[in-house]
Structures are given as C-alpha cells and as structure tokens.
Regions:
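Active-site glycine-rich loops that stabilize anionic/oxyanionic intermediates
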Residues: 57-60
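Alpha/beta-hydrolase active-site loop
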Residues: 100-126
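Alpha/beta-hydrolase-fold enzymes
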Residues: 145, 149-240
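Short beta-strand/loop motif that positions the catalytic acidic residue
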Residues: 266, 272-274, 278
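Short alpha-helix in the alpha/beta-hydrolase fold that links the catalytic acid
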Residues: 268, 282-291
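Catalytic active-site module of serine/aspartate enzymes centered on a nucleophile-bearing elbow/loop
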Residues: 297, 302-333
Length: 333
C-alpha cells in the first residue's frame, strides 16, 4: 500500500509505484460501441482473487488513479482501467482537448459493455500463463461521473458484476444555490440555440494553472502529483480536460433522470462512499439511493472532499479498509 501520510507519498510514488507501473501495466485500444477507438490500461495479478474494472470521473485520466490502481493490485486484484471517450487517449468527438463531450451517457454504458466483451472477459480465458479467470468475481469501482455511468450500466446489465463500489457517485449534481428549474431552463435554452459543442457558460479551456483549493482533493501532495501529469509534455495535451460541452451537460441531466427511473433494477451489493465536504455531487441523492435500493451500504467520510482517494492519513486509511472489507466478502465467497 502507498503510505497514507502526505509527506511519504511522493517518495513512495517515485521509488516504488512509478517503476511498478512500467513493469506491470500495459495499455491498448478497442473499438467502442460505434467503432471509435477507446483506450484502456490493465494490470494482471499473477494470483488474483478477483477483477476490478475502474471508471474515472469527469475530466479524469489514468494518471490520477496510479495510487488507487497500485493499492488494488497489491491487495490481490487484477485491474482494468477504462479511459472514457472524450478523455485521455480515447476518441474525441470535438477538436478541443480541454472539452468533454458526449451525446448520451448510454454511449459510455455501451463502451463499457464492449470493453468487457472484447478485452476483460476474453483476456481471462486466452492467457495461458495465468489461472482460469472465468470463476473469479468481477467488481466495478467508479468515481463521480463514473459512478453515474456505473449505475446506469448495472441497471441495464444487472448480471455481470458481483458487486460495485461507488466513490462520490454522481447520482445527482450539486448545483449549490441554483434551483433545478433554472438549471433545466438553461439546458433547454442551449438546445434551442443549437449550442452543442460550445462550453457550458463559465467553463473553458485548460489554462495550465493549479487550483488546489477549488479542487476535489484535500491532500496537496496527491493533487500536485496528478497535476504534473496533466502538464507532462509526453501526454501531448491528452490529460487537459477542463470543462463540458453544452451537449454533455444536457446528457448528464438526462442520465440522472434515467438513473432514478430504473433504480429498481439495482439488486447487486453496492458500497456508496460519501465525501462529507463534497461540493461537486449531491450527498442527499446518495442518501436517497442508499434508502431506496436493496443491498446498498453507505459509508460517510466527514472530512473528505469530493476525491476521497486524494485524502490523506486516517481518512485514506479508512477508505481502503472499507473498500477491501466489502470486496473481500464476495472475493472469498
């Protein structure tokens, strides 16, 4: 495990995790639901007790989850990380590397289904030097926007994953003091005006400056690590996502409505991890989901901001203990 203490984080990442990434992680591409190329990363554990498929959040990319992936691997899991379309090295429907754009969240859902069908499941049966994975439990770990996508996927395909961990899931968006009617009216206005691949008002291109205080991280060292990866010349701007198109924003509102409409399909065990100081997603919506679906457990982290995995100390220690205790119930079943 990467040390939880902030002062030990960077040395450990430099001397242990970065070399491990070079030796154990490989990447590739596969055709998404529409044939567009989607990027992924994988780390195959030689003695796995389960498989974890990871979905990142809005404007996320692989480098932001190096620590999470390493810790999951060290705990005995094989990891498959999907870089969602319009993020990282995956297909971009618009020219700006800073803009996240999608027509409908079902595109994400079907990309995940394609990922499972073409990479994850075949990978387990075609690799002769690894044990037979077909009997291993399959888990889903998803953060924020990934949590919304995961929930939609689990509603549409309820029999694939044994259990899911939703970390600060975007069950609804936190709009602060802005009333929902005004949000919906603005979304309708952008549609009537034909604003599709234009930024949502108030958002724009990545400016190359750090904004730690406004970020979802509470550990400066962890924030700085992923921010440096955003700036890395070798990434050629692939990690500079910074805002959404109006089309993506409308799609997100539709996805949230659909999520609630189909919630009765959520029957598999769910672990909802809630950040007490979250200003990005709506905690009350997470509470409601916990109350309205079967087999849902919610654990709150009072001092955490949106990215609980970018906390430190006791909060981060609790985060991983809760996740592994939950997954181990089904990995050992």
């Amino acid at each position: 495990m990467v040390p939880f203490e902030a002062e030990k984080f960077e040395p450990y990442m430099k001397t242990v995790v970065r070399p491990w990434l070079q030796d154990h992680v490989e990447d590739g591409q596969f055709p998404g639901w529409d044939g567009k190329l989607i990027h992924f990363y994988r780390a195959k554990n030689p003695s796995p007790k389960g498989i974890i498929v990871m979905l990142h959040g809005f404007c996320g990319f692989f480098g932001k989850y190096h620590e999470v992936l390493y810790n999951f691997y060290e705990e005995g899991y094989s990891i498959y990380f999907l870089e969602l379309r319009s993020h990282g090295l995956s297909y971009r429907p618009v020219s700006s590397p800073s803009m996240v754009d999608v027509g409908d969240f079902d595109e994400y859902v079907e990309d995940l289904k394609s990922f499972l069908d073409t990479i994850v499941i075949p990978d387990q049966t075609e690799t002769s030097d690894l044990p037979d994975y077909t009997a291993l439990p399959l888990f889903l770990y998803a953060h924020s926007m990934g949590g919304c996508i995961a929930t939609l996927f689990l509603e549409k395909y309820p029999d694939i994953f044994q259990a899911a961990v939703l970390s600060s899931p975007m069950i609804d968006i936190n709009f602060g003091s802005t009333p929902r009617w005004k949000v919906n009216l603005t979304a309708l206005g952008t549609k009537l005006l034909g604003w599709n691949d234009r930024y949502v008002p108030g958002q724009g291109d990545f400016d190359g400056k750090p904004y730690f205080e406004e970020s979802g991280a509470s550990c400066r060292e962890r924030y700085d690590y992923s921010f440096r990866l955003r700036l890395a010349p070798e990434s050629q701007g692939a990690n500079t996502m910074n805002g959404s198109s109006c089309r993506w924003a409308r799609a997100s509102l539709r996805a949230i409505r659909r999520l609630w409409k189909d919630k009765s399909s959520l029957t598999m065990p769910l672990l909802i991890l809630q950040a007490g100081k979250d200003t990005y997603v709506d905690n009350q919506a997470e509470n409601r989901l916990r109350n309205e679906v079967r087999n849902a457990l919610l654990i709150r982290f009072p001092e955490a901001k949106h990215e609980i995995f970018n906390s430190e100390g006791k909060t981060l220690e609790k985060y991983y203990k809760v996740i592994f205790r939950f997954l181990d119930q089904y990995a050992d079943a």
